[in-house]
Amino acid sequence: KIQIRIIKGCQYKDWFIIAKEKAEIDRLSAHYRLNIDTSTINRLFSDWVIHDFGKLSAEYDKDSPVLISNTMEFIKNISNKFVIVVMDGMSEFDWSILKTSFWDIKYTKASLFAMIPTVTSVSRQCLLSNKHPINLQNPWSQQKEENEFRECAKELGFKENQISYCRGYDNELKPSIKCAAVIVNDIDDMVHGQTQERLGMYNGLSVMAQNGQLARMGNKYIKQGFDIFITAD
């Protein structure tokens, strides 16, 4: 049914629904040890990206940025004290498992497009800098990432002592902080060390969800008065 819907023609928002449905199929397939191949959907999406991705910069949605490069500005327009948690390499499939640890946290979910190429040095820097790849100081290296984020935060109106860039789950933010980026590499590390493909990711993410580190970190920052935005890159 998904493939038929794609062949009939998709608008960009249709892909958000398709991604969620595909993730659920993949999750159930891993959970019940079924051999369901959804790779055709990936191929059809690649075809759509080649023809239509370039048009997305002209799209607008008041409820969510369309491209990841507009995220920081969008967040600043709705929050004056926030933490953006970047789960490096997270997919819709990954989130479908991790979200089970958020049973006691109310949240809303939105979808948007990563930057192409989707390598970390490009897409994550675009996310944290509010820039397109062509405007990055160094799109092929992450050495300037923190600097890009800090410059972006200042352009959005934050002072130096209100900005924090850190990694991992156990950071303590100073009382002066109003704009923070937290980078978490667990999923990306899991992907690169994976030998059992989807089943291995399912098992690893299930353990990660049971541990609840991400949810605990979110709760901690919420109690400190921050709005929390968890995103992939």
What are the functions of these language-model segments?
Residues 1-83, 89-232:
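…; additionally, a secondary subgroup of soluble metalloenzymes is captured
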